[in-house]
């Protein structure tokens, strides 16, 4: 079944209809040589095993063989999760450890996703764009090319409450640290949002905005460009 991930109601339907998953990894010190492990992925022999699969299946194996198990340890990082994480192996970008990126996200070439960044379903990250540490791109958020989304900044999602219009950040824009772009707001190409700002309405191209709510304080000039320069070396 296909879903239109540009529509918040379709995303909600996708989440509702998806098979919920509670994957676990279990380390077992014991004899599982005769255990039935058809529904799980497993490795090991001679008294030590690693099992990976759904919680219900692995719990059954452990309980059925508890008299043969000396010790076991369970690792689990989600419960009834509706959306898996994005498969990063085919992404032509730099993604640092600790970034949380859900499936159905598009990441452009030479983008940089830093530690602690969170990118939700339906988001689009353009070529050469950096999502800095602990920044959040909500559902369907769209970042253009060579954008810098500063540390701790938030591009609000439009899944709940549902909105037809996603946040859109234009090419070469810079969003300062800890700033917030509210639902449906569009930031023009080349514009700069000062750190800590709360942007509640659309911003035109090539201006600087600051404050809460953010207001235009000047046009982007050479001094602004020097202070907000994008470094290509960070995107190699």
Curated annotation (Swiss-Prot):
It is an enzyme of class 2 (transferase). Keywords: Acyltransferase, Amino-acid biosynthesis, Diaminopimelate biosynthesis, Lysine biosynthesis, Repeat, Transferase. NCBIfam families: DapD_Ac. GO terms for molecular function: tetrahydrodipicolinate N-acetyltransferase activity. Pathway: Amino-acid biosynthesis; L-lysine biosynthesis via DAP pathway; LL-2,6-diaminopimelate from (S)-tetrahydrodipicolinate (acetylase route): step 1/3. Its EC number is 2.3.1.89. The keyword Transferase applies. Gene3D superfamilies: Hexapeptide repeat proteins (2.160.10.10), Malonyl-CoA ACP transacylase, ACP-binding (3.30.70.250). Belongs to the transferase hexapeptide repeat family. DapH subfamily. InterPro entries: DapH, DapH_N, Hexapep, Hexapep_transf_CS, Trans_hexapeptide_repeat, Trimer_LpxA-like_sf. This is 2,3,4,5-tetrahydropyridine-2,6-dicarboxylate N-acetyltransferase. GO terms for biological process: diaminopimelate biosynthetic process; lysine biosynthetic process via diaminopimelate. Catalyzes the transfer of an acetyl group from acetyl-CoA to tetrahydrodipicolinate.
